[in-house]
Amino acid sequence: MTLSEMLQSVPELSEKDAEVLLRAGSQMQYMADLSNTDIFLDCPIGDGKALVVAHAQPVSGTTAYERDVTGEIATAEKEPAVFNAIAEGVPICDIKAETQEGRPVRQNVCPVLSEDGRVIGVLIREKDISEELIREEKYEQLAKHFAQIDPQLRAEENSGRIELREVHHRVKNNLDRKSVV
């Protein structure tokens, strides 16, 4: 389905609202390619849901999606930034969310306003953070492991210092004895 056809399926939108959303949607592929991320245009349809009316994937680079999710429903539980931007009418940045396919992403969301200032849609930039979360988990595991062995290392380090001081003390005593003789 085209963006125009998708917008016709949202009864809350006037013709002028659809024109505003069509203008926003016409730039989505450029945004996807420029940011190397998935870009969406969602329209609120009530009951804590939004309809994905357009999806642009970067031509080169990676996408967080196996398929085009145009026509699918976004929910407040999985995409809180989308619904905060709809409710507040302000951009929401850097919020974790979950895709329709269950992948973790980080979202930036910008409301699209009608000519009279109502939120009629949102532009969404999503970046897959699966690898980032795996790295964070590995880092936490390493930190826990280090925290466990750190006291042992410090004890060994301290005993090594004591032994070194003892050696220095003995060398000094031997030098003192030789200087007396």
Which residue ranges define each predicted feature?
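Short regulatory/linker helices and ligand/cofactor-binding micro-motifs at input modules
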Residues: L7-E19, D150-R154
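Sensory coupling linkers of modular signal transduction proteins
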Residues: L113-S159
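Structured interaction and signal-relay segments at domain junctions
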Residues: M28-I92, Q100
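A short beta-strand signature within small-molecule sensing/ligand-binding domains used
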Residues: I92, G102-P111
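Short alpha-helical H-box segment flanking the phosphoacceptor histidine in two-component systems
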Residues: S159-R170, N174
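Signal-transmission linkers at sensory-effector interfaces
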Residues: M1-E12, K138-H145
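Conserved small/polar residues in nucleotide/adenosyl-binding loops
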Residues: V180
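N-terminal-proximal low-complexity accessory segments that begin disordered
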Residues: D17, R23-S26, A32
